[in-house]
C-alpha cells in the first residue's frame, strides 16, 4: 500500500515565466508539492514504489536493516512497512539530506508506521554507514550525486549488504542510440504534457535540473555495480527513459 501525505498540493511551481532560473534544489517549495510533481514527472513511479514493497516481502530477513537512501517523503518506506510486519526485529533507516523533504517524511512515517522501529536521519548519504542490510533503496537518488562519488556509494552498499541482500536502483537513463534516445526523451515529454504540464513548465524545470541531475546509461550503471562486487543484476522495470535495476549480493559473495 502506498500512502501519501495529507499536505499534498498540486504542482504549479513553473506555470509562470521565471526571470532568473537557478539550479534545482529540494527546498520547501518543491517539498510541498513533491508527491504530485513526481507522479506527474516520472512514468511508472507509482509502480516502482508498489513493487519495492513486494520485493521487501521476499528479501527482508529477521534481525536486519532496510535502508532508503534519499527517501524524500518516505514513499518507499511506506510501501515496505506493511509487507514486513510479520518479519521479526527489522528496522527501517530512512536518510534524506533536504531539511524540507525530511519534514514531510517524518510526518508520514510517524503517522503510519508504529509497529516497526524506524530511524529517520537528516544527512548526506555519503556519510551513512550501511550495516547488516537485507535491502537498500536508491530511488532516483544516485543521479543527483557527483559522478565521482557514485562508485564509492555502491561499494559501501555492497559491503554493508548481507549475503542474499538486494539493492533497488531506480534512475533516469541516458541512451546513446541516435534514434531511440530522442524518441524516449520525446515520449517522456509527452507523458508530462498528458499529466497537465505545459511546455513552459517542462522547459523551465529541465533548465533548472540541467546542472544538478547528471544521468548515466543502463550499461554504465551495470558496470559500476559489477565493480562494486554485485554478480547478479538486471533491469526489472522500464518506462521510456526511466527505470529500475535489481542487484543481488549472492549467498556466496564475500566481503
Swiss-Prot record:
Transferase: present as a keyword of the record? yes
Which Gene3D superfamilies does this one have? Vaccinia Virus protein VP39
Q: Name one GO biological process term.
A: tRNA wobble uridine modification
A GO MF annotation of the entry reads: S-adenosyl-L-methionine binding
Superkingdom as given in the UniProt entry: Bacteria
Q: Where does S-adenosyl-L-methionine bind?
A: 45, 70-72, 124-125, 139
First-level EC class: transferase
Which keywords fit this entry according to its UniProt record?
Answer: S-adenosyl-L-methionine, Transferase
- For the keyword Amino-acid biosynthesis, the answer is no
Q: Which CDD domains match?
A: AdoMet_MTases (cd02440)
Could you describe the subunit structure of this protein?
Homodimer.
Per the similarity annotation, which family is this?
Belongs to the class I-like SAM-binding methyltransferase superfamily. Cx-SAM synthase family.
What this protein is called in its record is Carboxy-S-adenosyl-L-methionine synthase
Q: Which organism is it from?
A: Hamiltonella defensa subsp. Acyrthosiphon pisum (strain 5AT)
